[in-house]
């Protein structure tokens, strides 16, 4: 990435945050940690809405805390929340709990890179 350790350290802190070193002690990656997303927003893995549909597989990453959350479940629960605590594990919370390939692929790259550090 860079010979500058400032960038290395920042990337590792970001990964730590994603994996649970945050205000909620919440891992945003399914299958890693003890407090993980159960009800990610996904058209493929909407288990909360239909228990015949599987949960998202391990390695799926939810979007995470978002102080500008803008969906009905977040609006109902997160009014006035402190930054980094604005998260709701609900299948309909697309602003905090959606899985997407753009951040899932970045997670795969960062985890692979971090393993070499």
Predicted regions and their residues:
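Aromatic (Trp/Tyr) and acidic
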Residues: 1-117
């Amino acid at each position: 990435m860079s010979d500058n350790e400032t960038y290395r350290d920042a990337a590792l802190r970001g990964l730590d945050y994603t994996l649970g070193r945050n205000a909620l002690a919440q891992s945003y990656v399914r299958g890693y940690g003890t407090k993980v997303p159960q009800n990610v927003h996904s058209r493929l893995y909407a288990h909360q809405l239909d228990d015949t549909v599987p949960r998202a597989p391990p390695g799926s990453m939810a979007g995470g805390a978002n102080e500008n959350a803008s969906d009905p479940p977040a609006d109902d629960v997160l009014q006035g929340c402190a930054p980094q605590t604005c998260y709701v594990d609900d299948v309909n919370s697309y602003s905090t709990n959606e899985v997407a390939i753009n951040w899932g692929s970045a997670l795969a790259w960062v985890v692979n890179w971090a393993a070499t550090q």
